Each structure stands twice: as C-alpha cells, then as structure tokens.
Swiss-Prot record:
Pfam families linked to this entry: GCV_H
Known function: The glycine cleavage system catalyzes the degradation of glycine. The H protein shuttles the methylamine group of glycine from the P protein to the T protein.
Cofactor: (R)-lipoate
Modified residues (N6-lipoyllysine): 65
Family statement: Belongs to the GcvH family.
Name the record gives this protein: Glycine cleavage system H protein
Gene: gcvH
GO cellular component assignments: cytosol; glycine cleavage complex
Swiss-Prot/TrEMBL GO biological process terms: glycine decarboxylation via glycine cleavage system
Subunit structure of this chain's protein: The glycine cleavage system is composed of four proteins: P, T, L and H.
Keyword Metal-binding: no
UniProt cofactor note: Binds 1 lipoyl cofactor covalently.
Keyword Transit peptide: no
Keyword terms: Lipoyl
C-alpha cells in the first residue's frame, strides 16, 4: 500500500511526525504506523506542562494487535494535547496527519527538526518495511 505523507512533515525512525506551526511543533504518528497497528482502542498521552526529551517515551497507543510506545521526535514543553483522540481513538485511526494529531510542543531547539527524515525519505523507508 502506498502512503501519502505531507511534504512539510518531518519523521522519526519510530514513525512519529513533527510539523512546525509558527513557533510550535505538532506531533503525531504516521499513517503507515496507524495502518500497521490496526484498530486503535486506547491512547495514553502525558500532561500539559510536561517536558519531552527527544527519543524518549512519552505515551502509548494500544490497538487490537499490540501496545506501542510513542517516542518524542523533538525535545520541548508540552503545551497542548488532542483531547479528542483520548476519548475517540478512531480520530487517530481515520486522520493521523490531520485531526488525529497527538500533541503540541514548544521546542527547546527547533533545529532538531532537521535531524528527522523529510517526507520523501520516510516514504522510501516505509516502502521497504
């Protein structure tokens, strides 16, 4: 299955994305990861005000197949979570790159985004997985 990934997104090896929006970064998981998980039944996210460190676990997604940890693609302060995916995980399932985003971070160092894969590189990576 071929996936479309927004050109302005940056992706971690662990399938989380980061999208710069002004001075904040929106974080979620890729459509590829959602597809691999299957039906998502539960999402666990940290609390607003928590500090995230790039590469460390910040929550989890539970599907009928597995529970997968979520890893921060960028370091910073959590300023907003998407409450709707907590109450309705199907939003993540149905629109992971849009309404199914997970959280918004005020980055400690926006340059960390450059360490993530661009959409084309990520698409090539998942094409062989």
């Amino acid at each position: 299955m071929a996936f479309q990934f927004p050109d302005h997104f940056r992706f971690a090896d662990t399938h989380e994305y980061a999208s710069l929006d002004g001075d904040l970064v929106r974080v979620g998981i890729s459509a590829f990861a959602v597809d691999q998980l299957g039906d998502i039944v539960f999402v666990d996210l940290p609390e607003v005000g928590d500090l995230l460190n790039r590469g460390t676990t910040f929550g989890s997604v539970e599907s009928v197949k597995a529970v997968e940890d979520l890893h921060a693609p960028i370091s910073g302060e959590l300023v907003r979570i998407n409450e709707s995916v907590l109450s309705s995980p199907d939003e993540l399932q149905n629109d992971p790159h849009g309404e199914g985003w997970l959280l918004v971070v005020r980055p400690a160092d926006p340059a960390q985004l450059q360490d993530l894969m661009d959409a084309a590189t990520y698409a090539n990576k998942v094409a062989v997985e």
